[in-house]
Amino acid sequence: MDNANCVGGCKFETRSFQYRRRIPYSLGADPLPPVHPLSLKNLVDIDTDLISSQLYELYDSIILNDSGLERRYAFVQKLEQILKKEFPYKNIKTSLFGSTQSLLASNASDIDLCIITDPPQCAPTTCEVSAAFARNGLKKVVCISTAKVPIVKVWDSELQLSCDCNINKTISTLNTRLMRSYVLCDPRVRPLIVMIKYWAKRRCLNDAAEGGTLTSYTISCMVINFLQKRDPPILPSLQMLPHLQDSSTMTDGLDVSFFDDPDLVHGFGDKNEESLGILFVEFFRFFGYLFDYEHFVLSIRHGTFLSKRAKGWQFQLNNFLCVEEPFHTSRNLANTADEITMKGIQLEFRRVFRLLAYNCNVDDACSQFTFPSLTDTSFMDDYVNELQLEIVPGFSHGRDSSDTSCTESPPEPSHFAWAFDPYNATASPYYNQNINSSIDYSSIYSNDVPAIPPNVPYTFVDPYTYACYINNNSYLPPSYMDFYTWYNSPYPKSSHHFDERHGGDRHEKNLSNSRRYSRNKFHKKKQSSGPFQYYPDAFSFTPTDNNSPPSNSSSSEVVSPVSLHSEPVLSTVQAFKS
C-alpha cells in the first residue's frame, strides 16, 4: 500500500498545527531598491572579535551535548523495538538523519528518523506506524500522509523528545552524509551553521510547513554555498572533486556520489583566515544586500551560482530564492517561501546586519519573535513598519547619532574605484586606489541626478549587469534591456519598460533576442527589418577589449565600472543609441 493513501480512515490523520503566516501579506511584493555597497558600514569598523566571542559562548551553551546524544539514541532504539514487534515480517531497520547525524543539532532539536524496510514494497503505511506507536504508549502521535514526504510525528514524555519518522526516503540519509562531510572539512563550518540556524529558529524563519518560510536544510545549504564563494574559498564542492562513481552510487535514478573523505580535504580553507564573527556578519551582508536573487541559483553541487535562465527556473512558482537540491537538481529547496516572504526574510537579513554592525550584540540580533494573539492586529502592522525601515540603509535607528562612519551616500568617488563582482562575496567591496580625478564620476553615485527626459534617445550601461558580463565570458544578459538600460529608470531590469518605450512592439524585442542567440552561434545569420539591424557581433565585448563599441552603437560614451579580472578601474564604455 502506498504510504500516502490512508487519508480518511486514520484517526491520527489530522493537522498538527494551525498555519500562521510568518511574513504578513501587507509587506507587499514590490522589489527592494538596490543598495550601493559603499553605503554599508565597512568590516574594519565592526568589532568582529567581540561578535566571535559572543557566538562561541552561545554556541557552547546550545550545541547538543553527550547526555543529549545518549537520550536520542535511546529513543531511536525504543522506536525500532516497537516497530520490529508490531511488524515482525517487514524486516525493519531505522536510520538517523538530519541535524543529529550531521553534527548540527542543538539541545532543542527534534530527531529525524528513516524507517527502512527490505524490500521497500512491503513497507507499512504512515497510518499503520502511527497506530503502532499509540498502542505502545507514545504520546502526541500525528500522521501527516498528504505531505510531499509523508511523516509520523511522535512524542516521548519520559525522554522529553519528539521525532519525525518517514518511510524508505533514503535520499534524506544521503543528504545528511553530504552535510556532515562539509561540516568536518573546516572547524568554522559547524558553529557558523548552528548559529545561523539558531537565529532562524528564534526569528521563526525556519518553519516551512507552519509559517511558509524556509527549512533548516535550505538554510544550511545557503551557508555552505556562501563558504564556497568566499575569497579564498573555505569549502570545496565535494561532488565536483574526483571520487568513485559507479552503479552503487545511483539512488532512484540520481547520482548521489560525492567525495566523502573529509580528512583529505581538511585544511582546504586554511588560506582564508576570516573568523567566525566576520563570516557571521558577512553572511547577512551578502544575502541582505549583495546577492542577485533575480538571476542566480545557489548550487552547492557546483560550488557556485547558476543562472536561473540556464536551469529554466525563471518562470517557476515561488522562485525568488532558488537553492538547488544537491542530488535532485531539478528541485528548488526554497520554493516553500513565496515572493513576499522572501522579501521579509531579506529585510530580516538586513536587520541582523544593522544590529551587528552598530551594536555588536548577538543577543539583540537573535531576539525571539513571538506571534501575537489572533485579536491583536496592530502588532503585525508595527512589525511591517519596522521591516520597512531596513529598506533604506541609512541605519538612523539603533545607533549613535555621532557615528558618521556610514552615511546614506557613498564615499567620495575620486578616492575609490568601485566595482562589485556578484560571483565573489568579498569581505570589502571597495579598493583603496586613487583614480583619475579629472573625470566627473558624480553621475554614477549621486542620487540627485535628474531623470533623463523621455525624448533623449540615449541609453546607459547598467553597472551591475555589465560587471557580471565582464567577469564571466559565459554570462549572457537575460535580455537586451538588462544590458543597456535607462539610467535612473524606475524599471532598470524590466522587459516591460522596453515594451513601453516602443509602444509594446514585440517584434522589436524578438529582434534583440535573436542577437543574443547569434552570439552563441545557435542560429544562422539572417536579415531583419526594424530600427535595430541584425549583427552577429552586436555583443562583441570581451574582457580584453572593454572599450570596443558594438557594431551598431553610437559614439556616445558613459562611465561604467568594468574589468574586474584585472586591476579595477573606471573607464568609458560605448553606449547604444536608440
Swiss-Prot record:
A cellular-component GO term for this protein: nucleus
InterPro entries listed in its UniProt record: MTPAP-like_central, NT_sf, PAP_assoc
Cofactor(s) essential for the protein: Mg(2+); Mn(2+)
Compartmental location: Cytoplasm; Nucleus
Record EC number: 2.7.7.19
UniProt keyword annotation of Phosphoprotein present: no
Record keywords: ATP-binding, Cytoplasm, Magnesium, Manganese, Metal-binding, mRNA processing, Nucleotide-binding, Nucleus, RNA-binding, Transferase
Biased composition annotated in UniProt, kind: Basic and acidic residues: 496-510
Record field: compositional bias (Basic residues): 516-527
Region (Disordered): 495-565
GO BP term (any one): 3'-UTR-mediated mRNA stabilization
GO molecular function: ATP binding; metal ion binding; mRNA 3'-UTR binding; nucleotidyltransferase activity; poly(A) RNA polymerase activity
One Pfam family here: MTPAP-like_central
SUPFAM superfamilies (alphabetical): Nucleotidyltransferase, PAP/OAS1 substrate-binding domain
Biased composition, class Low complexity, residue ranges: 547-565
Reaction(s) the record says it catalyses: RNA(n) + ATP = RNA(n)-3'-adenine ribonucleotide + diphosphate
Domain PAP-associated: residue ranges: 275-330
Binding site residues for Mg(2+): 110, 112
Role this protein plays: Polymerase that creates the 3' poly(A) tail of suc22 mRNA.
Assembly and oligomerization: Interacts with pab1.
Family: Belongs to the DNA polymerase type-B-like family.
Official protein name in the record: Poly(A) RNA polymerase cid13
Protein's organism: Schizosaccharomyces pombe (strain 972 / ATCC 24843) (Fission yeast)
